[in-house]
Amino acid sequence: MEDTAIIRSPQPSINAPGFHLPPTDSQQSSAIELPFQFQATTFGATETAAQISLASANAITKLASLYRHVRLTQCAATITPTAAAIANPLTVNIVWVSDNSTAKPTEILNVFGGSSYTFGGALNATKPLTIPLPMNSVNCMLKDSVLYTDCPKLLAYSAAPSSPSKTPTATIQIHGKLRLSSPLLQAN
């Protein structure tokens, strides 16, 4: 029986949490915690250089649209190889950075914590790989009364394959939980 466990690969990080506005002394608004997941990009057909900012990701802004405050409580990126990866192996470079980082996807291996993973082929992994967001090195407040420039951003890169696949050989999903509070007053 094949082991189908997801492999976790924590990214080394520098302890530099983001700052945010302190809560007021008044009673806090009620809050809910919602899960989210979205496909960030695919690999294998062409060169892929992706920069995914969580504060402006469509799936998150839809959930956040009815609230004034949104905090990220959990987050990870999962690279999932497809069956096409066996015949068309690929290497993916990935790193979590803050939104205001000037690093480009092609420079991932020059960023502290940047890693390279190979999927497919005869001997390499075809299991999903999860890279948790190092919450201690970014500002997890995605929406507030002010804009923050140090929210999480995922950089991912895969070079153009020597024999491009017609279908993706891997995808990246970003998933986690959001704490939404202070509902916005809306017209019915």
Curated annotation (Swiss-Prot):
* Location of the protein in the cell: Virion
Does Thylakoid count among this protein's keywords? no
A Pfam family this chain is assigned to: Tymo_coat
Which keywords are on file for this protein? Capsid protein, T=3 icosahedral capsid protein, Virion
Q: Which GO terms describe its molecular function?
A: structural molecule activity
Q: Which GO terms describe its cellular component?
A: T=3 icosahedral viral capsid
Family statement: Belongs to the tymoviruses capsid protein family.
Q: What does this protein do?
A: Self-assembles to form a T=3 icosahedral capsid composed of 180 copies of the capsid protein. The capsid encapsulates the single-stranded RNA genome.
The name this protein carries in UniProt is Capsid protein
Q: Say which species the protein is native to.
A: Eggplant mosaic virus
